[in-house]
């Protein structure tokens, strides 16, 4: 049987998360709770304090949707995995709102059919998206960025900057886009860190 670690960044729905953690009994679970959700963090810490297979990130990040803070939270999870010195065949980044559709045996069989050691990462070219990389997004890390006024202001600022300001910091890089979710090997995680 393959050894699995499941990492997740969560912000809500403690009951759903408890169902998920129970369903993942065959692996270790690493949880990052959004820094804005102190009550959830304290509750989960208390619930899992005696569970040797559940680990919680203590140095948490205030996560804003589609902001770099999502990457920071993911890196903190990977650093926590590495710090335990537990070796896994695969590390899976999932949502706290997920539920597994496969058993441990089915998951192992699927991975083995694709080749143990392969990474499962969605990657797409960005040809239809490149124009957006030249624009600055002003409110990505603002916790209010989903409010209508901020969205309208962001759109207005983008339109104003279009003819005058072009972001240049990606020149020389071949960029791709994809999902946040992945399943990677331990060696791949070490390479990332």
PLM feature spans:
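ER/Golgi luminal nucleotide-sugar-dependent glycosyltransferases, focusing on the catalytic module
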Residues: 1-193
């Amino acid at each position: 049987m393959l050894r699995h670690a499941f990492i997740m960044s969560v912000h809500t729905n403690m009951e759903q998360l408890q169902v998920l953690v129970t369903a993942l009994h065959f692996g270790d679970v690493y949880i990052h709770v959004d820094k804005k959700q102190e009550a959830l963090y304290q509750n989960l810490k208390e619930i899992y304090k005696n569970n040797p297979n559940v680990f919680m990130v203590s140095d948490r990040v205030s996560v804003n949707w589609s902001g770099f803070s999502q990457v920071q939270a993911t890196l903190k999870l990977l650093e926590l995995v590495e710090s335990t010195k537990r070796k896994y065949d695969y590390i899976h980044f999932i949502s706290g709102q997920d539920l597994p559709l496969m058993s441990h045996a089915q998951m192992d069989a699927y991975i083995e059919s694709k080749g143990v050691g392969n990474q499962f990462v969605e990657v797409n070219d960005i040809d239809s998206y490149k124009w957006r990389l030249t624009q600055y997004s002003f409110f990505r890390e603002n916790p209010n960025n989903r409010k209508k006024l901020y969205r309208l202001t962001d759109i207005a600022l983008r339109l104003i900057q279009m003819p005058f300001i072009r972001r240049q910091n990606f020149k020389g890089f071949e960029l791709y886009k994809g999902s946040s979710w992945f399943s990677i090997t331990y060696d791949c995680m070490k390479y990332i860190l």
